[in-house]
Amino acid sequence: MVEHDSSDESVNRRKYLKALTVGAAAGIAGCTGGGGTETESTESGNGNGSGGSTDDTETSGSSSGESWDSQLEVLHGWAGGDGEAAVTALIEAFEEEHPEMDTNFQAVGASANVNLNATILRRLANNNPMSSFANWPGKNLERYSGALMDLEADVWDAEGFKDTMQSRAVELCKFNDKMPAVPIGSHRMNNLFYNTAVFEEAGIDASSLDSVDALLDALETIDQNTDVTPMAQAMVAPWTNLQLWAQILTSQSGVEAYTNFIEGNPDRAAVVEALEALKTINENYITADASSISFTTAGQKVISGKAATIHQGNWVYGMFRADDSFNYKEQWDWIPFPGTEGIYFYHVDSIVAPSNNPSREETIAWQKFVGSKKAQIAFNNPKGSVPLRTDIDPSELTDFLAMTYEDLTDSEAYPPTIAHGLAVTPKTMGACKTAFGDNFMGPFNVEATADALVAAVSE
């Protein structure tokens, strides 16, 4: 899951968390499975069953799929781009297994996690939980503290997921002595995608790009030797700068420097060095409309040949794959972000269940399915991510994802992403985004941004 919008905090999170605390203390009683009118959304589902139960008691539906008493309501942010085809495939696969279950899958808004998180927090604060919702695990779950269901016995232990999921994903799905989430897929973050025709025209050998300096030299060569913009960048929201800066920091100063930063021991000199390199890129080598476009528009510039390269998570592959005229190893190719060879920058999407669940048995059946081979293959192939199960046959994935899956299981280091909820708390992540949003969207104030980043992780 990835963010698309122009702002990173459109809700009063403190107000909602206060309400959550009150609700948790009161047992969050009296909730229902409705609430679809609280936000603009796109709904899908089979429409079977009762249309959602308002009974406060636990449901008694069979987890074998023989009978169900309540509607399964799932919120997600995959409203378009890389995610729409993936979640559609996931829903279709689930409904094939449970055709008699009444389901309601809602894509919330067009701004992915921002609107989604606002809706989830509002629903939980109003004692109106949904069955499940898509979200990042790890420290991101702190925003929902006190309102999460424990799936350990009914899902994790019952299905043996602790033995079949990658251990890092298992740990990320633990929170406050519970396991409220099941991972659905992983995106690799440290990617550099490029248009092969543009690189060939400029005389760039992608395999030679082994450092940030080498990348900068290549961007300058493209700028001088072609009419193509060297790099597509999307700055309609600050997370893209934060994400790219993290790759540069790791490339220049190593995984240890990045780890020290997210753990609250930043090396300011390393922070500044990475910002200087990012400033060079943003001032000289990106499209003129970068401040107003999303990553999907930026990715289209690489497809059309208007931009030579782009750094993004491999959700961009999901977008590339949807274009039959833009093929891997032909029109486009990939390398690890220069200087991060042997590293898998770790991102995880998961499905989370809230407590006082309005459809307990249906939710358990759904969460079990999310962790199954069938679900993980159906979802990840179109998404551009890879399954987190360790027993997947790579031949069931596309060639690019089979390669990524091998890297997922056999890399030297797995630093967690700072821009997508795993590495730091929501408060710290928000402060890091604000550091870029306030100081690094043009003009690019290195010193002020460095001060704000250091302060964000040092509090």
From Swiss-Prot:
Disrupted-gene phenotype: Deletion mutant shows decreased growth rate on arabinose or xylose. It cannot grow on low concentrations of arabinose or xylose.
Keyword Membrane among UniProt keywords: yes
Protein keywords: Cell membrane, Membrane, Plasmid, Sugar transport, Transmembrane, Transmembrane helix, Transport
Family designation: Belongs to the bacterial solute-binding protein 1 family.
Domain of life per record: Archaea
InterPro entries documented for this protein: Bact_solute-bd_prot1 (IPR050490), SBP (IPR006059)
Function text: Part of the ABC transporter complex XacGHIJK involved in the uptake of xylose and arabinose.
Protein name (Swiss-Prot/TrEMBL): Xylose/arabinose-binding protein XacG
SUPFAM superfamilies: Periplasmic binding protein-like II
Topology in the lipid bilayer: Single-pass membrane protein
UniProt-annotated location(s): Cell membrane
Induction line: Transcriptionally up-regulated by both L-arabinose and D-xylose via the pentose-specific regulator XacR.
Transmembrane domains' residue ranges: 19-36
Keyword Transport: yes
Region of interest: Disordered: 27-68
Assembly information from the UniProt record: The complex is composed of two ATP-binding proteins (XacJ and XacK), two transmembrane proteins (XacH and XacI) and a solute-binding protein (XacG).
